[in-house]
Amino acid sequence: EMCIRDSREIICPTEYGDIIPSDITLSAGVKEFYEKGRESLLKEALSDIGDEYDYIIIDTPPALNILTINAYVASDYIIVPMSSEILSLVGLTQLKETVDSVRLSLNPQIRILGILLTKFNSRTRLANEVKEMAESVALQMDTALFDNKIRSSVSVSEMPAHGMSIFKYAPRSKPAEDYLCFVREVIERIG
């Protein structure tokens, strides 16, 4: 909870924007989030700094837990990254139910902005089948796939080990190009 209260003190400026890094200790403190009314802790913490930024991006793990719920309560939009694999489709139904529940009780304006396919290889039949199925699921979720997909690349797998973004580690790679196009598409959709 200390980190939540002192958000301004832990902001780290970078050349791409300010970040508040997470670490393994965040999950250790998750029990504090289970008290009544704790779904809005992140929203409250960000309210102090929200006016200073055009966009605040909250990166969450794929798990649907109280930390993720906090992110949903604090957000206007959700972007769903999904690797181009069949098993990735399974969690979308549960995600929709969770978002609907948050919308009903905690954040009526939240909206799924779209589904972003990652590790995409348009030359494989599987990736194209997953894309078709994801398009169908997206319609059921009242959203759409992003036109841009993040192509698969060794550089995307390697960069976390080097502690760098794709723009630093492999700035001329296809995924770096894809992410730039994706950011433009997000800004367009938000308007």
Give residue ranges: language-model regions.
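P-loop NTP-binding core
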Residues: 1-191
